[in-house]
């Protein structure tokens, strides 16, 4: 309703005027197709940021609030989320994971990959049309059921797989996500992405004053 929309607007406005949007890069140093990371402590905690890479994340253990576009959503153990390219977001973990001399550990597997991770030529093929369709959906942020057996298997094995198997597994799971997996869209249809680097730079200059 209108009250909730107004509340979200002012919360997001406060985020923009108190935090700089940081452009991050997750490009693999070894020329791999994408990055797989296993985290035991929160990364980019409370950092309002964006990156060209899509972010595909499984939170086995960890709770807090996800800010993405114009959406604010609690995250919890088991959540699986796909964030599209250049979508502003940040993960605000609960104090249990960031405060004190011995904060609790998280258990997270996260992948970062460019839209062209399997080459621009492959993406142009008719057989890869599912990727382009999924990339459009991911611009709204997608949250999947944590009890999906296929997604759970993917996240539990991807870090230990060979380089070739990683690549084929990611393509297969993205096809599944586009065609079969049930997802909740997080960002509202009316949200406009600041999709030009200059827009972010101008926003950050405004914040500096």
What are these regions (language model features)?
Residues 114-118, 139, 175:
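Helix-loop "lid/cap" segments that line or gate small-molecule binding pockets
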């Amino acid at each position: 309703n209108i009250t909730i929309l107004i509340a979200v607007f002012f919360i997001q406005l406060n985020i923009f005027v108190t935090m700089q949007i940081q452009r991050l890069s997750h490009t693999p140093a070894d020329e791999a197709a994408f990055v797989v990371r296993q985290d035991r402590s929160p990364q980019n905690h409370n950092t309002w940021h964006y990156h060209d890479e899509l972010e595909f994340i499984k939170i086995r253990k960890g709770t807090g609030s996800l800010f993405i576009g114009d959406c604010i959503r609690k995250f919890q153990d088991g959540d699986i989320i796909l964030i599209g390219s250049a979508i502003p977001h940040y993960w605000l973990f609960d104090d249990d994971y960031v405060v004190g001399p011995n904060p609790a550990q998280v258990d997270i597997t996260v992948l970062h990959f460019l839209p062209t991770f399997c080459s621009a030529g492959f993406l142009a093929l008719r057989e890869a049309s599912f990727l382009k369709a999924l990339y459009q959906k991911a611009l709204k942020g997608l949250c999947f059921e944590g009890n999906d057996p296929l997604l759970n298997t993917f996240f539990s094995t991807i870090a230990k797989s060979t380089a070739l198997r990683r690549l084929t597994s990611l393509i297969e799971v993205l096809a599944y996500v586009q065609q079969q997996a049930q997802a909740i869209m997080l960002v509202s249809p009316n949200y406009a992405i600041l999709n030009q680097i200059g827009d972010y730079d101008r926003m950050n200059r405004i914040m500096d004053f």
